[in-house]
């Protein structure tokens, strides 16, 4: 018997690829009457900067705070477009939005367990505004290290129009 999906972890790097994957998470949540946990992992402030010069630490801290603000704005933009496209209010489906400092793979696995998620949804081969590859090697590593079902969603073919960014 296939277990019922009650909670979906949607991990995002805020790329077009992961925004498209959000449609899948919304569709799954609506179909299964499930909730969505949205999470994004950000590289933490380097420990050496904490004890280093105050100026460098402040720059790193400001960059972190700026990234958090961009993340929240981006999630809002993606949600509005997803709502218009799917006809479903994603706000009603989202149970939590998390921004975690740390390695994306480690944080995805931790959040999936902490939030008791039944499945994980990822976009494939995304590249976020921090210009680090996120959901190519990340999706592979998550697949290898979790016992939960993982949905890796590629962008549609070039013939398909996707207005997400």
Feature roles, as predicted:
Residues 1-3, 45, 80-120, 157-165:
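Structural beta-alpha unit
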Residues 41-44, 70-72, 83:
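Redox- and metal-dependent alpha/beta enzyme cores, enriched for Fe-S-associated oxidoreductases
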Residues 2-58, 87, 165:
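Small/aliphatic-rich secondary-structure junction motif
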Residues 4, 110-162:
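Gly/Ser-rich helix-loop-strand patches that form or flank binding pockets
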Residues 57-73:
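A short acidic, glycine-rich active-site loop
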Residues 39, 96-100, 151:
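General small-molecule cofactor/ligand-binding pocket signal
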